[in-house]
């Protein structure tokens, strides 16, 4: 399979766009798609300050990076949910990413705020994902 733009070997196939791209051309395509979406829906202007919620996963980090590259004034927000098996790793990824790319970062620590997810889960008597969702939805 060949890249739609440069004819190099494609590494990403997008059947919904009837396209395939090499890594470099995909990054350009993705960036253009984000910019088009922002403009067509009038989501923000380059003068706006944008707070991007960062989980530490590829989707939120990719969005933060492309918005920064497009010239938007972005700040990251990470909610440390105090889940012993996953929160320290996610927080570390977000901190390293923001440091590496020079993005400002705000961290809200739910343990320090008296709302660690394991304790909230016990009180709600619900699965941990339910407790996490409630905190993210209603606390912020």
Where are these predicted regions, by residue range?
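ATP-dependent adenylation/nucleotidyltransferase module used to activate substrates
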Residues: 2-140
């Amino acid at each position: 399979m060949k890249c739609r733009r440069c004819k190099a070997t494609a590494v990403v196939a997008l059947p919904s766009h009837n396209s395939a791209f090499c890594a470099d051309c995909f990054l350009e395509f993705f960036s253009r798609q984000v910019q088009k979406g922002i403009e067509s829906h009038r989501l923000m202007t380059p003068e706006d300050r944008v707070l991007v919620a960062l989980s530490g996963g590829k989707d939120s980090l990719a969005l933060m990076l492309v918005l920064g590259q497009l010239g938007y004034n972005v700040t990251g927000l990470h909610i440390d949910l105090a889940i012993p098996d996953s929160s320290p790793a996610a927080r570390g990824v977000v901190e390293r990413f923001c440091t590496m790319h020079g993005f400002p970062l705000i961290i809200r620590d739910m343990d320090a705020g008296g709302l660690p997810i394991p304790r909230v889960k016990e009180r709600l008597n619900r699965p941990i994902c339910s407790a996490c969702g409630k905190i993210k939805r209603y606390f912020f």
